Amino acid sequence: MGLLDNLFGRKQQNSSSVAKERLLTVLVHDRVHLTPHDMEEMKREIIAVIERYVEVTNPEAIEVTLTRGEAADHLKADIPLGRSRQQ
């Protein structure tokens, strides 16, 4: 997979960049006062709302993350959705 990753521009992260990313995530969680339990509850609620409108194909693959931006913190939800056929 390393060759394919290099061909398609995917970069492997070294341990220091992974550690830095994890530390930033912890800092953002602390800054917005969300516990891991609160994040999981928010994730469940987001899924429930989205499922009212579209099919969520793989709930286990959903990722909800908080990131620190220059001007504001950001909540990102990566949710795989089913495709419907055009009629």
Curated annotation (Swiss-Prot):
It comes from the Bacteria. GO terms for biological process: cell division; regulation of division septum assembly. SUPFAM superfamilies: Cell division protein MinE topological specificity domain (SSF55229). Keywords: Cell cycle, Cell division. Disulfide bonds: none annotated. Belongs to the MinE family. HAMAP family: MinE. Prevents the cell division inhibition by proteins MinC and MinD at internal division sites while permitting inhibition at polar sites. This ensures cell division at the proper site by restricting the formation of a division septum at the midpoint of the long axis of the cell. This is Cell division topological specificity factor. The lineage of its organism: Bacteria, Bacillati, Chloroflexota, Chloroflexia, Herpetosiphonales.
